Amino acid sequence: MEIDQRGHLIIGGCDTVKLAEEFGTPLYVFDEQSIRDTCRAYKNEFESRYDRVKILYASKAFMTKAMAALIDQEGLYVDVCSQGEIYTCLQAGVKADKLYFHGNNKTEADVRFAFEVGIGRFMVDNEMELELLDRVAGELGEKAHIIMRLTPGIEAHTHDYIKTGQIDSKFGMVICNGAAMRAVKHALGLENVVLHGFHCHIGSQIFDIEPYNEAVKVMLEFANEVKKETGWNIEQLDLGGGLGIKYNDQDKPKPITQLADVVTGAVKRYAAELSMELPELLLEPGRSMVGEWGTTLYTIGGVKEIPGVRKYVSVDGGMTDNPRVALYQAQYDAVIANKADRQPEETVTVAGKACESGDMLLYNIDLPKIDKGDILAVFSTGAYNYSMASNYNRHQRPAVVFVKNGKARFIVKRESLEDLVRNDVIPGDFDDK
């Protein structure tokens, strides 16, 4: 954290107090250079240890046209899971063959749209999707190039809502009960489907890297069984993302270097033990790419103290720009941006402005003495905040700026009141008769 001589918080060379004045609050602020540095770290750490690697940015973490363009400039591919994410990438100039299309319930419209634009890979989640892809590909005279998502039965120690690798999951085909093998044989028998590899994702916000080692073991052993039964060789192994980040002082995330050591070492070791050719290795970082490099600025309004109980501080945002506290009991660190050099003087709970008792941002956080009009900076809001923002209570979604070398640039304009009603319609014959 950088603080100038006035005690103001500085991000990307920009005074956050001035950012709040210029762009208004709530405001999402992203440190562009740090995002680029993280992209390069993922590429460098994995490519220096393994010959064939693709890094796919998990766009659900944070996606705008500018973000898509940045990812493309840094030489990464993109993990997408909707027509909207695909369209955003295309509008930013990303080539469709660099997009890998996820999703557990792709509709026929989704599939046709993906074929139309020339999607790179379909990440297949179930056997019904195989049938859909084969049929539509046949009608269009195309081939569906796929990677199958499998459930390896790995228990990652994280929040229940962001575990995905255990057997009881809505995602993927289970290996241990035979469902995955049946699906593979099904895929190999389809005329218009080309199977390239397997994918798994064991969860998010993971601090213990050992489950990645186990995931590699399970996935390659399964690939070896498939080879024995069908003669098919795995070309691509996608191990998803999930590396945790620091939200507060209790979080101890592992560095990218350690993840690269464990993953590449495991792939080489188990492939050698099984006498398999090394597959191309794919990773899908999202949160760890952008999470720590986003900060949300708020203006403090009312203060309410209940003696002997709690002191509430209200801000001009809340669950409409950050629903993760309500969804996951997420915890954050924060400072008063215009008093960033001062020591804490009081313990407060920061409440959002939505008409909802559960709209809280920070519980029992120690901050300097707070005055109306102060600017609150909440850290590590780069992932799944803008992405999950809503118009609840008809609040406008905030603006987003990239900051770099002392310069701030809009990448998303603040929504206007006109934007809120742009798609609303009152039918011409709408009356009580």
Predicted regions and their residues:
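Charged (often Lys/Glu-rich) extended helix/loop segments that serve as interaction or gating elements
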Residues: 262, 272, 276-433
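Short acidic, glycine/serine/threonine-rich loops at helix termini
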Residues: 68, 91, 111-116, 133-136, ...
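Active-site loop/helix belt of alpha/beta enzymes
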Residues: 153-302, 367, 393-395, 404
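A charged N-terminal "starter" segment
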Residues: 1-145, 181, 185, 189-190, ...
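Short beta-strand segments
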Residues: 58, 145-151, 199-201, 238-240, ...
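Active-site-proximal loop/turn and secondary-structure-junction residues that shape catalytic pockets
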Residues: 61-63, 84, 105-107, 126-128, ...
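Hydrophobic face of alpha-helices
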Residues: 36-39, 216, 260, 377
